[in-house]
């Protein structure tokens, strides 16, 4: 579950957020993974209150409860809750992730391959996460090249224990993505099968590129 980030306002409607979470939790079968992404929308006290209520219903991770610059506040939230708190999707390079862990100490690190510095830099962040004993769960809101680069990098590390995000938020309709990149970018029964072809294993459909070019 992810809260809207376009009209950001702190603590906008925690009651509505909780009711939405409760409905989804009741809808999902027992044992199915469910996380909640606050999109930096809560204050410290509200994040702790919400997290405790989510814990009573069953939550697997609590993503970005606070603005990404509030590292001391993030530590307060992570220390107060049992649920794994995740952060890092807006952060760049291993040096910032060093500060994130030292000052905010989230349970899960979520680098985005586009904003964190690309595959080589993200691999270094993953290696640091292993040293810090932190699981990683990449942020990847674009099906296609973004997801494939992130998945290939993610597949190389031992602390890749959480589900990888699959989203078309910034990539357009999934049918268009499929037409552009082929079957390799589409999950099968919830799993991605990585190609062993050179690079990311993607071959652009030039006809589709022409068709979708504005």
Please state what every model-predicted region is.
Residues 198-214:
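Extended hydrophobic packing segments that form well-structured cores
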Residues 62, 92, 194, 203-205:
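Short, electropositive, low-hydrophobicity segments enriched in small/polar residues
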Residues 1-81:
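Metal-dependent enolase-superfamily TIM-barrel catalytic cores that perform enediolate-based chemistry
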Residues 52, 58, 69-191:
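Shared catalytic-loop signature of beta/alpha-barrel
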Residues 10-13, 36-43, 63-66, 88-89, ...:
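Glycine- and other small-residue-rich loops at beta-strand/loop junctions that grip anionic moieties
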Residues 192, 196-198:
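Helix-coil boundary/capping segments in enzymes
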């Amino acid at each position: 579950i992810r809260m809207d980030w376009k009209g950001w306002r702190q603590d906008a409607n925690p009651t509505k957020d909780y009711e939405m979470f409760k409905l989804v939790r009741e809808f999902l079968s027992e044992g199915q993974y469910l996380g909640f992404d606050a999109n930096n929308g809560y204050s410290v006290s509200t994040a702790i209150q919400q997290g405790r209520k989510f814990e009573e219903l069953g939550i697997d991770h609590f993503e970005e409860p606070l603005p990404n610059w509030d590292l001391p506040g993030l530590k307060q939230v992570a220390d107060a809750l049992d649920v794994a708190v995740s952060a890092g999707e807006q952060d760049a390079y291993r040096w910032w992730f060093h500060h994130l862990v030292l000052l905010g100490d989230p349970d899960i690190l979520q680098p985005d391959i586009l904003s964190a510095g690309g595959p080589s830099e993200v691999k270094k962040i993953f290696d640091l996460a292993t040293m810090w004993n932190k699981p990683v769960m990449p942020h990847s809101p674009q099906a296609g090249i973004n997801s494939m680069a992130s998945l290939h990098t993610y597949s190389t590390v031992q602390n890749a224990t959480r589900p990888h995000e699959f989203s078309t938020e910034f990539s357009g309709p999934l049918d268009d993505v499929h037409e552009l990149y082929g079957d390799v970018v589409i999950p099968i029964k919830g799993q991605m099968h990585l190609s062993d072809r050179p690079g990311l294993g993607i071959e652009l459909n030039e006809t589709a590129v022409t068709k979708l070019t504005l």
